[in-house]
Amino acid sequence: MLADYRLKWGASKLNVYEGPRRGFVGNFLSLTCNAQVQADYYSFSDQDDIWHAEKLEHAMEWLRTVPSDTPALYCTRTLLVNEENRPIGLSPLFQRRPAFENALAQNIAGGNTMVFNNAARQLLLRAGPLVDVAAHDWWVYLAVTACGGQVKYDSRPSLRYRQHNSNLIGANRGLLARLTRIRMLFKGHLKEWNARNIEALGQLRSLMTPPNVTLLSDFIRARDSALFGRIRKFRSTGIYRQTALGNFGMLLAVIFNKL
């Protein structure tokens, strides 16, 4: 199929590369860090996306206001549809500002909504395609905010995302999704993901802003402290999730040493 489209559109518009077969994170980062791919702006996509016609237009309207040497990330909500392309809901609406204090606790948007500039891509190149992170989109959010970049979260959905039983990553909404996250928290998944993200951020430490270097160090110390010290140190970091329920869940994670 891809070969047919390459013939139809021309080799200059569609290139096909062999992936590393290391799961979705390794595959996305392999392509993102491919030296043969050169552009001013980059966007992720997969087979379950149906882009809105104005997606790139809205992204570029904002990205062009950011200096080219400043890492910049545009992301949005998602319109969820079923296998027949019928709308079934929206991804969560987040209203608190995007920041490193938030990125340490969660990702705010799916990679399929993200468009980022070359300065942001240079951060991903610095860490490399083999960096061990929980998710490629969360990693972009972490890298850009850690290094003083700008993030625009647009409440307007930029695409339709098909939901079906074989989705690798769900929509992150509804009671079932919340229960799944709670179960994963108490199984230690969140703590493992944070450990991997912290290790990966070490690759960018020299590019991080001084306040964010301090914040990361405080976060690490809080995770390594005993119960009451952990609670006190964590509260002093200012790290937050986007919702009250999310912050309550994070407090439980701190108390039970699952962060």
For each feature predicted by the language model, list its residue ranges.
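Nucleotide-sugar donor-binding/catalytic module of glycosyltransferases
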Residues: 1-174, 255-258
